[in-house]
Amino acid sequence: AEPPDASIELIVYAAASMTETLQEIAGLYAEAAPNVTLTFNFDSSGTLKTQIQEGADCDLFISAGQKQMDQLDIASSPEVNTEGLDFVDTDSRVDLLENRVVLVVPDGNPKDIQSFDDMAAGLSDGSILMAMGNSDVPVGQYTQKILRYYGLDEDALPPSGVLSYGTNVKEVTTQVSEQSVDCGVVYCTDAFSAGLTGVDSATAEMCGPVIY
């Protein structure tokens, strides 16, 4: 066994929405365990899942969605883990925390969007531009559920272009912060970190629980 003060590196793959939180935790953890170096790779959970699948070194995976974790877990149903991947120690899995999906607007809220109802109406008539995550990342998948809740077909929305996409939640918050869009759907934690105004929160009925 290694001596208790031996240098250890832990490679942590974590959803982009965990960036600020984990960096703060790392600073505190360094005081408690100075011999441990935490090396982070932050990106969308879908991208991280692919990197792990392709053999990248990873000691800990924190996914913003259960789907990406299930796809790497041999104990998951074959309907989810369609490739029979075995990259996760099933017994080590824990539900770590819960987040919320919120609707955010840029400074001044020029389109006066106050709720998901307003968002749905604006998307239906093509009067707003909304940022959302790609379909392969959890925040995008939660947004798709919200669209379906309102009976909106993502592919059938006005061809003028009412949707703008981001490869992870940070790209979505950036689009809103830069006022490139009229609103965006992100996690509560990212809205707080980016100083964005959240005007509404999605219920579990709208998009299900957001479990990491």
Language-model features: where?
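Short acidic (Asp/Glu) patches
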Residues: 82-89
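Charged, often glycine-rich, active-site loop that binds/positions anionic groups
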Residues: 55-57
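Periplasmic-binding protein-like
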Residues: 59-63
